[in-house]
A protein has these predicted regions:
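N-terminal pro-sequences and low-complexity stem/linker regions of secreted or lumenal proteins
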Residues: 2-5, 9-456
């Protein structure tokens, strides 16, 4: 079992990381050469960063923006419900539990929840003592970082998971625009991803990770792996690559990926820390930061997902909506984008920005993220707006530690497949599952140093 983190460890980690951050930087421009800029708004963006979290639906996390705050987006309106197995009605409600049980969200369960577009099978799919949780929604006080980012930048209220199924196929679509027909959490060997394509084009890219890099466990790609600690120093020095995917801590006592039943307060602290590091980076003015989730995790959403053109049978059906915010110095402020998007939209954006050939027809057809950019801020020479200062996340470590002591068992790990797959292919220095708590302590220390987190 991983060692639990303490407030002292967070503070000690902060001293060490602060000293490292004080070292001279190597420059203030992203790695990757002087490629030709395309015309249009994307030509003003040099650096793309994606933080993909785990297993939450749009209504579950951001639906209350409309229901309780009146925000003009496609959220909850009140009266949403599903039937329980006994025929009783379960209405949507405010969920007070930060660590709910993990609802089913595999291929078959997700399709049962969808039920041909009725979206009425969520409670039945999670039948049992915790079945009502899937109709629960969180509010601003529980998700302070996400809600402030949604206030400050562009919320995408029609960003769908790429697959109506679990984590791996959806993350494959972020990386490669396909899972090659894989419906479950299993490796796809030989997958050609955006990392391969950027490497061949001489454009820098990295998979920053806490305990495990998905690229390594998912399809055995081990080039460009960088530890999350290096992300903070790279951001401060202006040395982030052209494209980065940030993987949260998937396992152990430091898990901060938002996958149930991991504590969502650690997820808020991670988001705040990443945003603060990016906002303070010399690269912020020409950056696009995408915060999204891989899939809905079995939680209710009222929007029936659409279909697209796809060569693999069954994969033309998109998954449920996931919470997504696009941030950056040139992004529209306080906006809502309702264009149909999915994880492959990230690849479409990179393809058009860097003049790449689309990885496949799905990437070629996907809508890119250019509409998130403010036309007034993408004209050459225009001054960008400063980053929003996010209120620090108050993190009660004592409460988190108490919960882990009460819960942790070896068979509780929701990412067992990824951990086992990574163990088979990763060099020892990149397999850090046993260090999960210490790694997250170092990330929290960075967040505290940047003023994004207060540990108590």
């Amino acid at each position: 079992m991983a060692e639990r983190f303490t407030r002292r460890e967070v503070m000690q980690a902060g001293l060490a990381l602060g000293a490292a951050a004080a070292l001279p930087g190597l420059g203030c421009s992203s790695e990757g050469g002087d490629e030709v800029r395309p015309p249009g708004p994307l030509g003003q963006i040099d650096t793309f960063v994606v933080l993909m979290m785990e297993n939450r639906s749009f209504d579950h996390y951001l639906g209350s923006l409309k229901l309780l705050e009146g925000r003009a987006l496609d959220g909850l309106v009140g009266g949403e419900s599903n039937l329980a197995p006994d025929g009783s009605t379960v209405a949507s409600f405010k969920l007070d539990d930060f660590t709910v049980e993990d609802p089913p969200h595999g291929w078959n369960a997700s399709h049962a929840q969808w039920n041909g577009g009725a979206n009425d099978g969520f409670v039945k799919a999670h039948a049992g003592p915790a079945q009502n949780d899937v109709m629960g929604y969180h509010v601003r006080a529980q998700l302070p970082t996400l809600y402030q980012l949604a206030d400050s930048y562009t919320v995408c209220d029609r960003w769908f998971a790429s697959v109506m199924g679990p984590t791996w196929p959806n993350r494959f679509h972020l990386h490669a625009g396909t899972s090659e027909g894989m419906q479950s959490n299993n490796p796809v060997l030989g997958l050609r991803s955006i990392f391969h394509q950027l490497e061949e084009a001489g454009i820098s890219a990295a998979n920053y990770y806490h305990d495990i890099a998905f690229a390594a466990g998912g399809y055995r790609f081990t080039k460009g792996l960088r530890k999350i600690e290096q992300f903070f120093s790279d951001a401060a020095a202006g040395r982030l690559p052209r494209f980065s995917i940030i993987d949260p801590a998937f396992g152990g006592d430091g898990a901060n990926d938002d996958h149930p039943d991991h504590d969502i307060r650690l997820g808020q602290a991670l988001m705040a820390s990443i945003h603060a590091a990016l906002a303070a980076s010399p690269q912020w003015d020409r950056m696009l930061f995408v915060l999204t989730y891989d899939e809905h995790g079995g939680f209710y959403d009222h929007v029936a997902p659409p279909t697209i053109t796809e060569s693999h049978p069954g994969f033309e059906q998109l998954g449920f909506r996931v919470p997504t915010v696009v941030a950056g110095g040139r992004v529209k402020r306080g906006a809502v984008l309702s264009a149909q998007l999915e994880h492959t939209s990230v690849l479409a954006t990179l393809t058009r920005r860097f003049g790449l050939s689309p990885l496949n027809a799905r990437v070629a057809a996907a809508t890119d993220l250019a509409e998130c950019l403010d036309p007034a801020l993408v004209m050459p020479g225009m001054q960008v707006q400063p980053a929003t200062v996010i209120t620090p996340v108050e993190l009660p470590l004592s409460a988190l530690r108490g919960r882990f002591r009460a819960r942790r068992r070896p068979d509780d790990e929701p990412h067992r497949e990824l951990i086992e797959a990574a163990a088979r292919v990763l060099p020892r220095e990149h397999y850090r599952v046993a260090e999960s708590a210490a790694i997250t302590a170092r990330v929290l220390a960075e967040g505290a140093r940047l003023g994004a987190v207060r540990v108590r």
